[in-house]
UniProtKB/Swiss-Prot annotation:
GO CC terms of this entry: nucleus
Function: Component of the cleavage factor I (CF I) involved in pre-mRNA 3'-end processing.
Single biological process term from Gene Ontology: mRNA processing
First and last residues of each zinc finger (C3H1-type): 28-59, 61-88, 89-117, 118-142, 143-169
SMART domains reported for this sequence: ZnF_C3H1
PROSITE patterns membership: ZF_C3H1
Species: Kluyveromyces lactis (strain ATCC 8585 / CBS 2359 / DSM 70799 / NBRC 1267 / NRRL Y-1140 / WM37)
Record-linked SUPFAM superfamilies: CCCH zinc finger
Source taxon at top rank: Eukaryota
Family classification: Belongs to the CPSF4/YTH1 family.
Single GO term (MF): RNA binding
Protein name listed in UniProt: mRNA 3'-end-processing protein YTH1
Matching Pfam families: zf-CCCH, zf-CCCH_2
Predominant location category: nucleus
Length: 210
């Protein structure tokens, strides 16, 4: 050990295990998978716990993250690999870094799905209510949902936790409200139409003016 390059491996801060556990700081991404870790029992299954230098693959990411070695054609584990050996967007979890920042430092070799929420279409409110007058020409997204039979009858005890759709009543706008005209407006319009017909008859010579 020298003064210029001291050996600090025996020293550790109290917050380092937390950083390794929550954010995987100072960990080699190519480190091997821990053979003691069991996803069912969690961190207790590994004798080293959060201080383990190897990977603890969570069950939510099991066989969902694309193997970066497979992308390069260099993976030697074949079917024994704990990562996904296919580029299926439906199975890939969303990249949290890209969602928060709008870019990814690992692109184009990122193992997670990059979803641009700004480019996604909004759901059609009319369709969710039960009918969209625009039909296939609608510029918004039509998401097919199964209507809740209990809600259609009148009440669903599950409320917001129900897996089926609860269509909501939309308050009609001002232009869609039924307008009731008064009798005086109707009579005035009839008188105007009668005057117009009489004037046309005079012009055409059907009625003689004395």
């Amino acid at each position: 050990m020298s003064i210029v390059h001291p050996d600090t491996s025996k020293y550790e801060f109290n917050f380092e295990p937390f950083l390794r556990k929550e954010y995987s700081f100072s960990l080699d991404p190519d480190r091997p998978v821990c053979q003691y870790y069991n996803s069912r029992e969690g961190i207790k299954s590994c004798p080293n716990g959060a201080r383990c230098p190897n990977k603890h693959v969570l069950p939510i990411f099991q066989n969902k993250i694309v193997c970066k070695h497979w992308l390069r054609g260099l993976c030697k584990k074949n079917d024994q690999c704990e990562y996904l050996h296919e580029y299926n967007l439906r199975k890939m979890p969303e990249c949290v870094f890209f969602t928060k920042n709008g870019y990814c430092t690992q692109s184009p070799e990122c193992q997670y799905l990059h979803v641009d929420h700004k480019s996604q279409l909004e759901e059609c409110e009319d369709y969710n209510m039960g009918f969209c007058p625009s039909g296939p020409a609608c510029t918004k997204k039509h998401v097919k949902k199964v209507l809740c039979p209990r809600y259609l009858v009148g009440f669903c005890p599950l409320g917001k936790d129900c897996d089926w759709s609860h269509p909501k009543f939309k308050v009609p706008s001002e232009h869609s409200k039924l307008r009731i005209k008064k009798d005086e407006h109707i009579n005035t319009r009839k008188m105007d139409e009668e005057r117009e017909r009489r004037l046309n008859a005079i012009i055409n010579g059907d009625i003689l003016v004395t």
